[in-house]
């Protein structure tokens, strides 16, 4: 089991090059299954979940190659297998995105019920119901979701009972090759959906309205090859901005877009931080000041992102004042608070709300990561705590942060990865 050892405290300052967004790269990689010709993707992050996606695609018969520059070539022209198996899918819930492209292009597909972070219920029902409305026949058999269709799927009006990024992406992918027009109402509006639509349109799809709550897709008979650059990771950007805020530092995030992170930037300014933006950079200068407590309520985009909640929990436990953080997207997403409390934080959980009473300093401790975003908040807590902090179960962090210890060392952190052979 790998762990991080962090020797704090220190100020985090410098420049960070932001990686491509995992939450765009994964659906785009699966969407490449729709194309009859090779596609080339750049700015694809080097992450465990991306590697898992490569393995799933190869199981389907897709040729996947990453060259020395980091560009990824995908050739799905000779797919000969239509099952995404349990041994790969169990580690990553995003695997459900394999289903829609398979049934849209080949009229059959099977995906094991997915795994991933354990942060509450993440049902695949909305993915399934969307495909059913487009004419797919769905069976649940021995832990697999099986989808078949008698010829091409057909266009449909699909209203999302709940705003869902995953289901919006599934329906949008399937609709590109459907006969007729599909309308998705109450669609998710995240930047990663916009990026996936740009990729699909580059292959010849006819999608309009991505980034609004109504997306219209006019089906085409086939999709062809293209080149596409994955959008910058807004969550990684926000994470490094928080790193500067909690450590009294100044960090510039390079190769990113402020318009994908407006709610986070607004809250950082409310916390007393100076944030300046250019076309492709965001800089946070704390001026050595302790942040002020800010209330947070997670919401679908363009609201405050749930994937920044854990980082702002850390900000609030070291801020001046008391704050309330309400989580409306996922259940069970405050598992980092007991771990932060081991480091001297004063956090309480009341249902879907956390109450944070700010303290001036944290102290080192041994803590355990419970999910992807919780893990980075604990690593950053170690950066500002006095002494040596050990963060266990860091495999979570490798799922979503590219070369994280190298990037942290580049802005002043003392962090090392080490392995333990035995677990009690």
UniProtKB/Swiss-Prot annotation:
Instruction: List, from the UniProt record, the residues annotated as the active site of this protein.
Output: 117
The record, for SUPFAM superfamilies, names: EPT/RTPC-like
The pathway it acts in is: Cell wall biogenesis; peptidoglycan biosynthesis
Chief place of localization: cytoplasm
What are the entry keywords? Cell cycle, Cell division, Cell shape, Cell wall biogenesis/degradation, Cytoplasm, Peptidoglycan synthesis, Pyruvate, Transferase
Residues reported in the UniProt entry to bind UDP-N-acetyl-alpha-D-glucosamine: 93, 162-165, 307, 329
Any idea which positions bind phosphoenolpyruvate? 22-23
GO MF term list: UDP-N-acetylglucosamine 1-carboxyvinyltransferase activity
Q: Which residues carry this modification: 2-(S-cysteinyl)pyruvic acid O-phosphothioketal?
A: 117
Annotated function: Cell wall formation. Adds enolpyruvyl to UDP-N-acetylglucosamine.
What's this protein's family per the entry? Belongs to the EPSP synthase family. MurA subfamily.
Q: What is this protein called?
A: UDP-N-acetylglucosamine 1-carboxyvinyltransferase
**Which organism does this record belong to?**
Actinobacillus pleuropneumoniae serotype 5b (strain L20)
Q: Which gene encodes it?
A: murA
């Amino acid at each position: 089991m790998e762990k991080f050892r962090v020797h704090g405290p220190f100020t985090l300052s410098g420049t960070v090059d932001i990686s491509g967004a995992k939450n765009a790269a994964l659906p785009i990689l699966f969407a490449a299954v729709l194309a009859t010709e090779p596609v080339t993707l750049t700015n694809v992050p080097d992450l465990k979940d991306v590697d898992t996606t490569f393995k799933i695609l190869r199981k389907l018969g897709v040729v996947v190659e990453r060259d020395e520059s980091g560009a990824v070539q995908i050739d799905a022209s000779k797919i000969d297998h239509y099952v995404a198996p349990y041994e790969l899918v169990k580690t990553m819930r995003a695997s459900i995105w394999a289903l829609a492209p398979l049934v849209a292009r080949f009229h059959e597909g099977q995906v094991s019920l997915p795994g991933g972070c354990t942060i509450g219920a993440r049902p695949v029902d909305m993915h399934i119901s969307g495909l059913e409305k487009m004419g797919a026949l769905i069976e649940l058999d021995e832990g697999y979701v099986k989808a078949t269709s008698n010829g091409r799927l057909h266009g449909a009006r699909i209203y999302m009972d709940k705003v869902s990024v995953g289901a919006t992406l599934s329906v949008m992918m399937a609709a590109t090759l459907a006969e007729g027009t599909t309308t998705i109402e109450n669609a998710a509006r995240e930047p990663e959906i916009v990026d996936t639509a740009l990729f699909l349109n580059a292959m010849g799809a006819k999608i309009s309205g991505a980034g609004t709550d109504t997306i219209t897709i006019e089906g085409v008979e086939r999709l062809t090859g293209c080149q596409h650059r994955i959008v910058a990771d807004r969550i990684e950007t926000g994470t490094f901005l928080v790193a500067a805020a909690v450590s009294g530092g100044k960090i510039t995030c390079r190769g990113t877009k402020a318009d994908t992170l407006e709610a986070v930037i607004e809250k950082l300014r409310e916390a007393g931080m100076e944030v300046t933006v250019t076309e492709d950079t965001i800089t946070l200068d704390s001026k050595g000041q302790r942040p002020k407590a800010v209330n947070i309520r997670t919401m679908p985009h363009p609201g405050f992102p749930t994937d920044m909640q854990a980082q702002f929990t850390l900000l609030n436990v070291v801020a001046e004042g008391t704050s309330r953080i309400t989580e409306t997207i996922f259940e069970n997403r405050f598992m980092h608070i007991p771990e932060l409390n081991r480091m001297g934080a004063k956090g309480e959980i009341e249902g879907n709300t956390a109450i944070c009473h700010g303290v001036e300093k944290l102290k080192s401790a041994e803590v355990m990561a419970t999910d992807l975003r919780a893990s980075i908040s604990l690593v950053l807590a170690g950066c500002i705590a006095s002494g040596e902090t050990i963060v266990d179960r860091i495999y979570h962090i490798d799922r979503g942060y590219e070369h994280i210890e190298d990037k942290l060392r580049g802005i002043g952190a003392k962090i090392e990865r080490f392995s333990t052979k035995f677990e009690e």
